[in-house]
Amino acid sequence: MTATLALTEDLIRRRSVTPADEGCQAVLETRLKALGFTCEAIVSGPDDFRVTNLWAVKRGTQGTDGKLLAFAGHTDVVPTGPLEQWNSDPFEPTHRDGRLYGRGAADMKTSIAGFVVAVEEFVKAHPAHAGSIAFLITSDEEGPAHDGTIKVVEALKARGERLDYCVIGEPTSVDTLGDMVKNGRRGSLSGKLVVKGVQCHIAYPHLGRNPIHEAAPALAELAAEVWDQGNEYFPPTSWQMSNIHGGTGATNVIPGHVTIDFNFRFSTASTPEGLKSRVHAILDKHKLEYTLDWTLGGEPFLTPRGDLSDALSAAIEAETGVKTELSTTGGTSDGRFIAKICPQVIEFGPPNATIHKIDENVEVRFIDPLKNVYRGVLERLIA
């Protein structure tokens, strides 16, 4: 069994359902300290949602004047769902048909193990490496993400810590290892809209105001609106409704209000304030009586082609023969926080077809090549 596979299996055995870490970071800390890393635990969150974060750094011969390459990842995993639907224990790594099964196999314990072993090999080969290496690991990525990476970033920013490059181990590949990496992500802006009416008997509509009827034309306009055209890196901004709640459950009562949940996934071609203003203008045009609460989940971020993307692309092609595609599709990630203190942030990991699913798995044939790609990035940027 290879070192990467062994560490991956060790991490999968730990039932680290968010925000639990279940000793994953202690395993990493032991191995990193043996390499000369300085490790710092940053614990945050209320007693009923305690989050464990690890910041570990090893300075190169150039000290703080040299480049710093960080790896960011999360030890927490999503819940398993119905255990009876799994073909094996989700927390007992199991091999079938060339695949390693277990919760977190793809998202993202294989990536964490791969980078740790890559660093072990790199430090052994280059004990006097010029640049610095860091790990930013959290147990609050799959949850609300209020006390995870964002808290570490705040602490690093407060003391003036500079990151030059960051690789996030998210599972970005699609059909084969290395066919896609993420060099940015769209922003996320959510709204909870409550349109008010006047409740009454459905047979006497003149005695009330139906908020569903009043809201419908505005919702149709919002759904049809072209928010922007996107740009060379991002698709056009998308507005989608996720939930509509209205009525008492009775079929003879016009409701007093209707609640609509919606979300923007927006590109760098739009801003949160600009989107908010346009939504309010449409609602006001339809003369609705409403309240609207906004939640900004994250700003979009983008890493144009540069040292990090070039090094990663070259490492992928050297190991796999695949020419990778830079993409900004998909949901948000902790990159939205890290981009505030790091100019070059890229996500790369194994194929994502089974993440968050029953029988999550990773193909064993990709595990050590993933590690080799990570080592290739280290060799190209900080040796």
UniProtKB/Swiss-Prot annotation:
Zn(2+) 1 binds at H74, D107, E170. Its cofactor is Zn(2+); Co(2+). Zn(2+) 2 binds at D107, E142, H356. The keyword Lipid metabolism does not apply. GO terms for biological process: diaminopimelate biosynthetic process; L-arginine biosynthetic process; lysine biosynthetic process via diaminopimelate. Pathway: Amino-acid biosynthesis; L-lysine biosynthesis via DAP pathway; LL-2,6-diaminopimelate from (S)-tetrahydrodipicolinate (succinylase route): step 3/3. Keywords: Amino-acid biosynthesis, Cobalt, Diaminopimelate biosynthesis, Hydrolase, Lysine biosynthesis, Metal-binding, Zinc. Its EC number is 3.5.1.18. The active site is at D76, E141 (proton acceptor). It catalyses: N-succinyl-(2S,6S)-2,6-diaminopimelate + H2O = (2S,6S)-2,6-diaminopimelate + succinate. InterPro entries: ArgE/DapE_CS, Bact_exopeptidase_dim_dom, DapE_proteobac, Peptidase_M20, Peptidase_M20_dimer, Peptidase_M20A. Binds 2 Zn(2+) or Co(2+) ions per subunit. CDD domains: M20_DapE_proteobac. Homodimer. HAMAP family: DapE (MF_01690). Catalyzes the hydrolysis of N-succinyl-L,L-diaminopimelic acid (SDAP), forming succinate and LL-2,6-diaminopimelate (DAP), an intermediate involved in the bacterial biosynthesis of lysine and meso-diaminopimelic acid, an essential component of bacterial cell walls. Belongs to the peptidase M20A family. DapE subfamily. This is Succinyl-diaminopimelate desuccinylase. It comes from Cupriavidus pinatubonensis (strain JMP 134 / LMG 1197).
